[in-house]
């Protein structure tokens, strides 16, 4: 095999590959073995037609496409490795010369990973956020725990207040006409939760059980149902029941109820403080790392191919869909409720996709510039962590992953981020 790489404008280039005749003839042999199984010629059983008769009847050219299908997936990656390039998209293959007994010549128009010109990435002067936890932070967290343990108790007397839960019937009208999805009976709504259209919940405050009221609101301009967006509406409301939150006492019994590992409120308070400190530390670390990466990427220069952005957008869409599925939703439902379509969502994600791609390219360039290497021991350590996380033997993890090349690249990028933190 001979390989020639010609760089063209931007990140494009042409790879010219010449495959020796013996290799091409072997591919023709394999192609014939595949094709002949489907060929019937009078006097011969299917699959038993002699090669010479096949070529006489159909021509050797009938085998060329199958031979290419066998050959290209093997020879193209070899050529890429020999040329030392990193394609980021499927190649455009053009066969220049194909003839039995001769060398095969094909070209591949390729988009490659861009070169990155690093700017400042050391001494970026970004500081880590303060991670101190105050007594107020701890008390607020305990109050949140208290709120989550609250019971709803029916108010026999009194009016609706912020934070109360009301059980109500409602029916909405636009231009005097009821609309689909605008009616419910015995619906439980926490007043002040922001669950309903802006202005709806505020108008319930002060009402008593049994009260009826016309609640006037205007649907937001960006409301998911286009036929309602921006329109004024009237909801006929009837309050059946008002429930107030009854908070448990903050005492030792409360502490034991929310955490069986503690015996007193003092122990719960101390444990809560440590948990908040750990959370703040992790949050500050993550923010610092993100800001350093973004700044280093901002200082770098790279002509990013659209193919890389498109690939990242597809990855982000899959991640988004997985998050929706965890919430019991899918893309179709999301588009229905949001009023968006796939193109609009991708356009919304585009800037983040570009930042992700440039950040990753920058980190790879930093790893190369600083000669950051990943050892076999570090790979084994990472595999062990994965095995522990998934509760599987390390060998099973290795089989599932196959090649560890991708893992090595990920670890190298992680080392580049560590380098930015240490040299900020």
UniProtKB/Swiss-Prot annotation:
The record's InterPro entries line, in alphabetical order, gives: PPIase_dom_sf, PPIase_FKBP_dom, Trig_fac, Trigger_fac_C, Trigger_fac_C_sf, Trigger_fac_ribosome-bd_bac, Trigger_fac_ribosome-bd_sf, Trigger_fact/SurA_dom_sf
Q: Which GO BP terms, alphabetically?
A: 'de novo' cotranslational protein folding; cell division; chaperone-mediated protein folding; protein transport; protein unfolding
Coiled-coil region list: none
EC class name: isomerase
Report domain PPIase FKBP-type positions: 163-248
Location of the protein in the cell: Cytoplasm
Q: What is its EC number?
A: 5.2.1.8
- What is this enzyme's catalytic activity, as reactions? [protein]-peptidylproline (omega=180) = [protein]-peptidylproline (omega=0)
Q: Which UniProt keywords apply?
A: Cell cycle, Cell division, Chaperone, Cytoplasm, Isomerase, Rotamase
Q: Which GO terms describe its molecular function?
A: peptidyl-prolyl cis-trans isomerase activity; protein folding chaperone; ribosome binding
An example GO CC term for this entry is: cytoplasm
Q: Which family does it belong to?
A: Belongs to the FKBP-type PPIase family. Tig subfamily.
* Domains: entry comment: Consists of 3 domains; the N-terminus binds the ribosome, the middle domain has PPIase activity, while the C-terminus has intrinsic chaperone activity on its own.
Q: What PANTHER family does its record include? A: TRIGGER FACTOR CHAPERONE AND PEPTIDYL-PROLYL CIS/TRANS ISOMERASE (PTHR30560), TRIGGER FACTOR-LIKE PROTEIN TIG, CHLOROPLASTIC (PTHR30560:SF3)
What the protein does comes down to: Involved in protein export. Acts as a chaperone by maintaining the newly synthesized protein in an open conformation. Functions as a peptidyl-prolyl cis-trans isomerase.
Name of the protein: Trigger factor
Q: Which organism is it from?
A: Bacillus licheniformis (strain ATCC 14580 / DSM 13 / JCM 2505 / CCUG 7422 / NBRC 12200 / NCIMB 9375 / NCTC 10341 / NRRL NRS-1264 / Gibson 46)
Q: What is the lineage of its organism?
A: Bacteria, Bacillati, Bacillota, Bacilli, Bacillales
Gene name per UniProt: tig
